[in-house]
Amino acid sequence: YGTKSEAEIAGRVPALLGRLVERFNPCIAVIACNTASTIALAAVRSALALPVVGTVPAIKPAALASRSRVIGVLGTDATVRQPYVDRLSADFASDCVVLRHGSAELVDAAEAL
């Protein structure tokens, strides 16, 4: 999803998960993608009648563990520019400097593994 537009992700993820839930009837759904979670998690939670867990940048545990109070977030371009990441930083790392680096190459690297 790192190379898709936000509009594509916002439309595709809830629709896709809705179809999967109808087909498989799970007890819980996990969005195991930072980009999809930071863009579509709220919409998916509103649309589905089951718990939905998202995977988002681990800013909270990083802030708890940091001694330098400087946190680096490496993600896709779409992930690092999301307001969701702004809120995580404000809520859990307001006393830290949160450096963000977005890279389209992460998608290629992950898919090459």
Task: Say what each PLM segment does.
Residues Y1-L113:
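Non-catalytic structural scaffold of enzyme domains
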